[in-house]
């Protein structure tokens, strides 16, 4: 039987099984079924075990969702946690999109799924309550979120020394093993076009995983082949030199730091060098101190602040967490665990992460998600304090991007233009350093009657700015972000005229 026939049979059996409901995998997998029959039964049982029927406080939806663990190293007992949402319409025809957040050490469930582009957002309520996101990316694709590496969120290892060996290489390999095994669990999606997207330190994760898939596909068996078509990264850490240079320049240009501090950093820091002098560190400490009173990740957004009756602060308050000054292994913004909050006119809630952590630590939520099966000894958090060591991180991802462009993969880079951590200035410097030929220079793109941002089309790469968005573009500009992913997946240019 051909692979497409097997996948079709699995999908049909899957649908029939839900109609029958009571049929067990053991009954379906009899001695007379043969290898294919038992394979279908095992797949069916695994999918049924991961099916999320309903979450506490969830509004009714018509799409299916799944969550659970996929083992990536049996010897060490390493398993990564995922959450998967079928597309709202025609999931059998839509691509599969994997979303990764950065850190390193931060959860794609907490940021990506629950606060940016997933279908459900936890709300501030005494009882569990989820709000349906009208701009969820599962309107465009079958949407997969992964907590990676182990030690992040609900992902775990039974070998404690694994935590001390984490780095870019291990993360890419484990994520690749996850995908190979996940597609075995969901073979009906194996022939679909597959894309990877992410933000921040996923500027490392996404290209490295894409390159590993590209290389492994050359030697992989048919059952392990991954149908990778492209990648998209936003406000991405790409190159140490240009990222640091652009970060300082953006802060000065946007009136965050003084002339004197700007000149002090430029005088004492050579961002081309790996070693940092004491004078440079001192200057950068002064620079990061400024962001204790501002949201570095969205320059014009309010911070989550404590009320006068509850002035206690959390270890995860961005303003109170030391900010690494060099080599940029920096966790995305964490929000205060305080009751006080303010809202922007557009509805952005700077304390959204507080609601997410409260929701994800509920026992009934974890049971519904088939999560925390090992009963981890610490609460679920957006960014893991367990991941405190990082063994390898290349100074530049530009060589990897060149490889992927040369391989013919679709590559898009986007940038929210109010992010101070990996600002649009830094990304523009990085792409200039990449050295690709410009096909169409600085061009406005539109979302209805308004300018959504600007594009630069390179030979093999598309650069898109998103006007008024911070580090987490889908959080601040959800409509524009959904438009962006639709056009990326459709391989279409963004509209250059109002509509």
From Swiss-Prot:
<dbReference type="GO" id="GO:0006508">
    <property type="term" value="P:proteolysis"/>
</dbReference>
<protein>
    <recommendedName>
        <fullName>Serine carboxypeptidase-like 34</fullName>
        <ecNumber>3.4.16.-</ecNumber>
    </recommendedName>
</protein>
<feature type="disulfide bond">
    <location>
        <begin position="304"/>
        <end position="351"/>
    </location>
</feature>
<dbReference type="InterPro" id="IPR001563">
    <property type="entry name" value="Peptidase_S10"/>
</dbReference>
<dbReference type="GO" id="GO:0005576">
    <property type="term" value="C:extracellular region"/>
</dbReference>
<feature type="active site">
    <location>
        <position position="419"/>
    </location>
</feature>
<keyword id="KW-0645">Protease</keyword>
<keyword id="KW-0964">Secreted</keyword>
<feature type="disulfide bond">
    <location>
        <begin position="269"/>
        <end position="280"/>
    </location>
</feature>
<dbReference type="GO" id="GO:0004185">
    <property type="term" value="F:serine-type carboxypeptidase activity"/>
</dbReference>
<feature type="glycosylation site" description="N-linked (GlcNAc...) asparagine">
    <location>
        <position position="124"/>
    </location>
</feature>
<comment type="function">
    <text>Probable carboxypeptidase.</text>
</comment>
<keyword id="KW-1015">Disulfide bond</keyword>
<feature type="glycosylation site" description="N-linked (GlcNAc...) asparagine">
    <location>
        <position position="310"/>
    </location>
</feature>
<keyword id="KW-0121">Carboxypeptidase</keyword>
<dbReference type="InterPro" id="IPR029058">
    <property type="entry name" value="AB_hydrolase_fold"/>
</dbReference>
<dbReference type="InterPro" id="IPR033124">
    <property type="entry name" value="Ser_caboxypep_his_AS"/>
</dbReference>
<dbReference type="Pfam" id="PF00450">
    <property type="entry name" value="Peptidase_S10"/>
</dbReference>
<feature type="glycosylation site" description="N-linked (GlcNAc...) asparagine">
    <location>
        <position position="73"/>
    </location>
</feature>
<keyword id="KW-0378">Hydrolase</keyword>
<dbReference type="GO" id="GO:0000325">
    <property type="term" value="C:plant-type vacuole"/>
</dbReference>
<feature type="signal peptide">
    <location>
        <begin position="1"/>
        <end position="25"/>
    </location>
</feature>
<feature type="active site">
    <location>
        <position position="471"/>
    </location>
</feature>
<feature type="glycosylation site" description="N-linked (GlcNAc...) asparagine">
    <location>
        <position position="372"/>
    </location>
</feature>
<feature type="glycosylation site" description="N-linked (GlcNAc...) asparagine">
    <location>
        <position position="375"/>
    </location>
</feature>
<dbReference type="InterPro" id="IPR018202">
    <property type="entry name" value="Ser_caboxypep_ser_AS"/>
</dbReference>
<comment type="similarity">
    <text>Belongs to the peptidase S10 family.</text>
</comment>
<feature type="disulfide bond">
    <location>
        <begin position="106"/>
        <end position="383"/>
    </location>
</feature>
<keyword id="KW-0325">Glycoprotein</keyword>
<keyword id="KW-0732">Signal</keyword>
<feature type="active site">
    <location>
        <position position="200"/>
    </location>
</feature>
<feature type="glycosylation site" description="N-linked (GlcNAc...) asparagine">
    <location>
        <position position="158"/>
    </location>
</feature>
């Amino acid at each position: 039987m051909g692979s497409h026939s097997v996948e079709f049979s699995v999908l049909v059996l899957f649908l029939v099984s839900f109609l029958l409901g009571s049929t067990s995998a053991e009954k379906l997998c009899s001695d007379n079924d043969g290898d294919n029959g038992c394979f279908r039964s095992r797949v069916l049982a695994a999918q049924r075990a991961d099916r999320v029927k309903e979450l506490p406080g969830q509004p009714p939806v018509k799409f299916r969702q799944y969550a659970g663990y996929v083992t990536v190293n049996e010897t060490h007992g390493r398993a990564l946690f995922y959450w998967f949402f079928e597309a709202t319409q025609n999931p059998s025809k839509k691509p599969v999109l994997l979303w990764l957040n950065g850190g390193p050490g931060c959860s794609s469930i907490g940021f990506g799924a629950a606060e940016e582009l997933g279908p459900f957002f936890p709300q501030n309520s005494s009882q569990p309550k989820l709000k349906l996101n009208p701009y969820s990316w599962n309107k465009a694709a079958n949407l997969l979120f992964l907590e990676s590496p182990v030690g992040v969120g609900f992902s775990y290892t039974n070998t404690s020394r694994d935590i001390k060996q984490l780095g870019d290489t291990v993360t890419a390999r484990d994520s690749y093993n996850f995908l190979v095994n996940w597609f075995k669990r969901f073979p009906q999606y194996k022939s679909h076009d597959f894309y990877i997207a992410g933000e921040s330190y996923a500027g490392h994760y996404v290209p490295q995983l894409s390159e590993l898939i590209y290389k492994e596909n050359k030697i992989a068996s048919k059952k392990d082949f991954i149908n990778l078509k492209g990648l998209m990264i936003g406000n991405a850490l790409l190159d140490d030199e240009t990222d640091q240079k652009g970060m300082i320049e953006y802060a000065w240009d946007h009136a965050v730091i003084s002339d004197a501090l700007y000149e002090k950093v430029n005088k004492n820091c050579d961002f081309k060098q790996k070693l940092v002098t004491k004078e440079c560190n001192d200057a950068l400490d002064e620079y990061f101190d400024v962001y204790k009173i501002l949201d570095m990740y969205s320059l014009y957004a309010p911070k989550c602040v404590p009320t006068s009756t509850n002035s206690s602060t959390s270890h995860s308050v961005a303003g109170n967490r030391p900010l690494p000054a060099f080599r940029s292994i920096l966790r995305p913004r964490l929000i205060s665990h305080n009751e006080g909050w303010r809202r922007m006119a557009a509805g952005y809630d700077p304390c959204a992460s507080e609601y997410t952590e409260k929701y994800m630590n509920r026992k009934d939520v974890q049971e519904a998600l088939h999560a925390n099966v090992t009963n981890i000894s610490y609460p679920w958090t957006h960014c893991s304090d367990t991941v405190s060591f990082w063994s390898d991180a290349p100074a530049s991802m530009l060589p990897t991007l060149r490889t992927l462009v040369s391989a013919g993969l679709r590559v898009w880079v986007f940038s929210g233009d109010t992010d101070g951590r990996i600002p649009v200035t830094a990304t523009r410097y990085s792409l200039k350093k990449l050295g690709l030929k410009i096909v169409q220079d600085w061009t406005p793109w539109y979302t209805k009657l308004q300018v959504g941002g600007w594009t630069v089309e390179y030979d093999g790469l598309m650069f898109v700015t998103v006007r008024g968005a911070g580090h987490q573009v889908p959080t601040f500009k959800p409509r524009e972000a959904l438009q962006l992913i639709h056009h990326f997946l459709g391989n279409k240019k963004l509209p250059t005229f109002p509509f």
